[in-house]
Swiss-Prot record:
Domain of life of the source: Eukaryota
A GO cellular component entry from the record: extracellular region
Any GO molecular function: aspartic-type endopeptidase activity
Keyword tags: Aspartyl protease, Glycoprotein, Hydrolase, Protease, Secreted
GO biological process, one term: proteolysis
This enzyme's EC code(s): 3.4.23.-
Organism of origin: Bison bonasus (European bison)
Protein name stated in the entry: Pregnancy-associated glycoprotein 71D
Enzyme category, top tier: hydrolase
Family (UniProt): Belongs to the peptidase A1 family.
Amino acid sequence: RGSNLTIHPLRNIIDLFYVG
């Protein structure tokens, strides 16, 4: 997911852990 990158960079990184 990269849509969160535009909203929040850190959220994108955390999302990677949640998805993974």
